[in-house]
Amino acid sequence: MNSRGARPLFAAFLLSAACLLPSCAGKPPEILRVLWQVTLVDDRERDVRYTSVSLFVKPSDPDGFEDLAELYLIHDGEELFWKLGADSWQKSAAADPWIGSNGIGLPDGSPLPAGEYRVLLRDVGGDSTEQTVRLPAVGLADLERLVPRVEVRGREIRVSGRGVSHQLWLYDANGAYLTVRPMPGNRQSVDELLAAYPQLAGGLRFRVYAASGQERLGAVSGPYFWEP
């Protein structure tokens, strides 16, 4: 769940965080790694475009994964924060899971302000740890030029545009996420996809991600459909 803090709310949040930090004698969590990415989303179902930040951390907690409670992205200068709880963050299926979200953004869909952000992880006892990330200044027009053009012709997917490379984000006919598959060129045979993923024989949905060539910036368009 995304939050935008007005000044009184932001001040109250900082006060509560300060009160909680020393309150517990348990072992604090750790952030082992942080991954982030800024993406322009071309949502064809809703006919809207907006920017979104993906933020994921690889956590460690001596008291167990279940001890983790909240993950925050905080911009102190702009008095903005986003809060993810254990009931709202996305979690990978790995033995050592990542937690985070692909949907961090502003209500109007504009890019997040550039600058330094704190990534704060808190456990149920109030102990916390944090790292910082720096988001670049992102021009919306530059990202919009990256949106790929996609065409499904028969049993072939064709992609064109300004992206330096492309990926297929694959889902089954019911919309369940399957995998990410790099595109070696600008065409992808559906038969190759069906051979690799037989569960898609009844149909598939997909999105196409275009990388900008700049680290952690890109655009994604979809969903698109193929049916036998």
Question: In which residue ranges do the predicted regions lie?
Answer:
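Sec-dependent bacterial lipoprotein signal peptides
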Residues: M1-C24
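Contiguous beta-strand segments within globular domains
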Residues: V41-P59, R149-G163
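Solvent-exposed loop/turn segments flanking beta-strands in beta-repeat/beta-sandwich domains
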Residues: P62-L71, S160-N174
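Aromatic sugar-binding surface patches on proteins
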Residues: W89-L106, P184-A195
